[in-house]
Amino acid sequence: MRRFSAIIFLLCTFALAMSAQHIQRNYHDRSMSDVLIDLDKASKRYKISFIYNELEDFTVTQNVKTANIPDAIRKVIGFYPMQMTVGDSLITVECIRKSERKLIGRLIDNHNLPVEFANIQLLNPKDSSFLCGGVSNANGDFVIPCQQKQALMKVSFVGYKTIYKLVPIARIGNVRMQANSYLLKGVTVEAARVVEKVDRQIIFPTKEQVKTASNGYDLLDNLSLPTIIVNRAERKVLSLKGGEVQIRINDVKASMQDVLALQPDEVTKVEFINVPGLKYGDSNLDAVINYQVRRRYAGYVGGVSTMQGTKAGFNNSDGYFKYNVKKSEFSINYSFSYRSVEERSYESLGTYHLPTGETLHRNYLGYDSPFLYTTNNVQLGYNLSEPDKYTLNVRLNFYNHNSPVRGMNQLYQESGKANQYLQNNRKMLEQIPSLDIYYSLNMPHDQNLALNLVGTYIGTDYQYRMREYTFNKSPDESVKNAPLTDYSYDATGRKRSLIGEGTYSKNWKQMALSVGGQYNISHTDNIYVGSSNADTELKYSNLYLFTQLQGQQKWFSYQVGVGATRSSIHQGENGYSKWLFRPQVTLQAKASDRLSFKWSSKITSDIPSLSDLSELRQYSNSFEARDGNSGLKPFTGYNNTLSASWNIPLMSVYLEGNWTYYDKPIATSILPEKREDGSYLFVSKPENQKSHDYKHLLLTPEVHLIKDHLDLNLMCEYQNVKTKGLDYSHEFNYFSYGAEIRYMTGNWNIGYGAYKVEKSFWGEKTNGGEPTSNLAVTYSYKNWQFGVLGLFVFYPHGCVYKDELFNKYVQQKNKVRLADQGNMLVFAASFNFSHGRRYHTGSRKLNNSDRDNGIR
């Protein structure tokens, strides 16, 4: 303990020494354009350049604590398909997945709380091949550029039921993720064999669930965890709440290759941690799924699998092999993905009302544009462990992503102006080697010490081409003339990072204590050449400390804790540092063997971003601009969730109510501003509005029609949102519903799910989700499994996602279409082999990784 305390003290001291200047912002549901404007205002060295309309649909909900502007931009970009190019004095941010169409929506849970880091995959409706994907942010928002008119959206997250919806590539509003709520605390549910604890559900897979699964993703999909969506085609696990889902194997954070190499018959139980504690360190984490697995002590295990789509280009292929001898395990994993999409487009129609009474119209009409990428991932591993004593795990990873084509072309129309053709394409090559070392030591008196160290290098070569032409009959004819503007550039990025983490835990009979910390330091250097010339060097450090206490007294369980984070980001003379605190309480009471209640409460504090605070005006075009606001103040959020679970042999019911209130939230105001020439400029400005009141009621009954064979899951949800601004007041009411049925018998597994389009609301905007209609049929024979996945079934024309803006001066309707996603079929096959006996490998409790290259 003394050594551990000394390490934490040194980390804190080092972090303070490295943090002379910091950039600290708290963005909530802010458009990416607004965020970049805010950061631009906060930057003394750099000018941030971007195309306003290209990034406006992407929203940011993020606490930014960095040492410089480049790191701050990387932070807000997150998992969005964007690239940042840094020059001497100019930073260019662009969407690397250009498309006239975008799938825009928000993932929320049964309490109307955002689901963070959920995995969203857009599949070809014809063959279920992967088109593109994304991850929801801290507010549950997701924006996925896609040229298709419609696609089969698969949303998955630990603790939530996987959502399959055939959606148009447009704004689809809220997408409700339902928790598998038939689990009861301390009660073994016979149909699913589940025991519920204060922070998790412990699921013991049934024979049928194991028999019809070929890997960890299949097994998780069969479990139908509440609010979790498993995308078999994309090999991702998403949360209906929109947040992140973390996958672990024996308490060690697992990669996609690890889950694919997981043999279902080796899984003893699955822990669905639906209320992640502070020890996980990520406030955006919706759930943690931990597979408890028996390991071999002699012999080998291996397998190969492939998925091939029938529409567009789609292929996933994987292979793995593990060899065990005594206390050691040697492993190698390889995965390959290929995506090629032709029919992606994005449409935006806007109406602008001038104070004079005149009305103007401004439209972006999308052309089908291509999209192509391949990924290769190799992982070498070594594990040395003695059960109940120690575990040493070493992994060497190499990730390669090559995207030679990412087009997004549009016809631009505006009242009183000649039409223009916008030609856009991006190319990116990314290579990421990393080394991960983990050690866990079990000590006397039920104590454990776990240490993790990860070093990563990220090399990125990026090419961006953006040109505007006078439209002449057709796109081909238009590009024959000289471009009106050219925003093209090349970027080269190099990043080095080191992540160290240590945790100490002590268990008593009815109580457990966890204390720990993590320190993350990185150095990023991105060079931009072209329309933007810059060399951006970013230094980042982050220190996280936490303490958490969990216990149980007869019918009552609790989990309380507090976390503190100090982030530091510096870019040249610009930077910031700030402490943030996260109190969290979860209580659970068992009323009877069949009925339990759970209450969870947390307080969040959101601060304005540097870009929002900067008094800088940024023009997206001659018609629109974005201002900062130095008078912005932090705002507080209060989140309370009350749920009840009731179970009888043939039926389980989960009921959840959530109330979230934001006091003086930051949202966008839009006002017309008269210029000297008499024309009007529509100015968007972040301001502290009055309030945002969100109420949510969710009911998810599950009926076990035939025990262990046929289950029917239903979902109905009502949400009421009241937004009060300085000059507006809106109230939104929305009702959604859905159903999913799964039949398992013998070697067959058949499932179908359909859900109504979800919608989300913030300020004066509504974001629409997509309808879900997905079918999966698999057949297992000995070590083989064959399957057919149907994405966006009964949607032959693909998906359309919609969103709207209801400002009194500006009204907008946006649609993202994925035309080639409708009725898409994906054929799958896998083969596994093994030999030898097993043992239970020591658990790994920590794991870290870095995939953020900093280029936009």
Model-derived features with residue positions:
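Face-selective signature of the C-terminal outer-membrane beta-barrel domain
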Residues: T375-S403, N424-N574, K578, K590, ...
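Membrane-proximal, glycine/serine-rich, low-complexity loop/turn segments characteristic
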Residues: V76, N112, D141, K161-L166, ...
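Short, acidic Ser/Thr/Gly-rich low-complexity loop/linker segments typical of extracellular
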Residues: K126-D141
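N-terminal export/assembly leaders
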Residues: M18-K98, S128-C132, V194-V198, I228-Q246
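Extracellular loop and loop/strand-boundary signature of outer-membrane beta-barrel proteins
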Residues: S305-M307, H361-D368, K417-N425, P483-D490, ...
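Outer-membrane beta-barrel translocator domains and adjoining extracellular loop/strand segments
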Residues: N316, E343-E358, P404-Q420, Y462-N472, ...
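Short, acidic, small-residue-rich periplasmic hinge/interaction motif at the N-terminus
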Residues: L36-S43, Y80, L90-E94, K98-E100, ...
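Outer membrane beta-barrel strand-and-loop segments of large Gram-negative receptors
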Residues: S488, S497-I499, L538, Y544-F546, ...
